[in-house]
Amino acid sequence: MNKLIRIALTFLLVMTTGVIQAEIVIYPVPQGIYYARHNDDYTVKVRQVGEKDWVDLYEYNVKVDMDTKSDATMVQFDFSGKVEVLVQKNNGEIRSAVVRPLSKGIQPEIDGNFLLFTIDKPQKLSVEFNGDRLNNLHVFANPIIKNVPDKNDPNVIYFEAGIHEPTDTAGKCFRIPSNTTVYLEGGAVLKGCLICDSVENVKILGHGMLLEPQQGISVTYSRNVLIDGVTVVNPRHYTVSGGQSTGITIKNLKSFSYQGWSDGLDFMSCSDVMIDDVFLRNSDDCIALYTHRWNYYGDCRNVHVLNSTLWADIAHPINIGTHGNTETG
């Protein structure tokens, strides 16, 4: 199956500007990982408010916390309108539950081993049962993508739903040229990193994922790079690393890591960086800002972090200035 499963519901939202049809979009799961990546701790379903039928979600197993190497759960879907999320806890009773961030003000209803809550806008949530933050459920409710790139455009690299491995077997990476849009369709799983080296005007978009790459996305000696919507699951090194680059924008990125030196977003000698609406759960620094390191030289300046969740199981949510180029006598 290489298309998104799109559920157009009859529920209508009547607005002053007209009538908008509400939707839920779920992603197919490649057969090659369907059983290997599933977590049985929870059964999660969604539906539009006012509808009868529930839509099943696939519960991904994601590793968190370097000390305990715990198995947490992640689900994703796209939606518009207002939806209910139903969670069944499959291993024991629910004595207490909380939906974070607490600033969202979501008060779940509990009935036996079921939990129910409602959302009406895109969210990145942690649902925690009985005080357990290590075996919790992550709910990523994305906005529906309106402008999908044309897969026949010569400047588009389009990854359809399914498993994709790089032809560069030595580096296990996909190298991206200048003036290119890379689109990861929901359900696309890349088993390799994305390399932007000495390029400009690159976009990496979509609701697909990078699964256990050596590193996630590397941006070096480059300018004007946009990363929007992708999920990086358990890379062995950085989720996104920037070196001596300018004009990097990262939006709606989700990241999990559990190994040493598996930072979230690290920037060495980078400028004009915008980080907005990201979820980083890492076992090293979630965000690190450096000047000189390795072969990167120059200032690190004009970095903005907005509307984001930084969850450092190990190390720091933000680390600034550890490395540099000191004078020697």
Segments (PLM) and residue ranges:
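Extracellular beta-strand-rich solenoid/capping regions of secreted or surface-exposed proteins
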Residues: 117-119, 164-181, 189-205, 211-226, ...
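Bacterial N-terminal signal peptides that target proteins for export
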Residues: 1-9
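N-terminal domain-start segments of secreted/luminal proteins
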Residues: 141-180
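Sec/Tat signal peptide C-region and signal peptidase I cleavage site
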Residues: 18-22
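Beta-strand-enriched, solvent-exposed domains that form extended recognition/catalytic surfaces
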Residues: 23-151
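Right-handed parallel beta-helix
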Residues: 179-181, 186, 200-210, 223-234, ...
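Bacterial N-terminal signal peptides
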Residues: 8-16
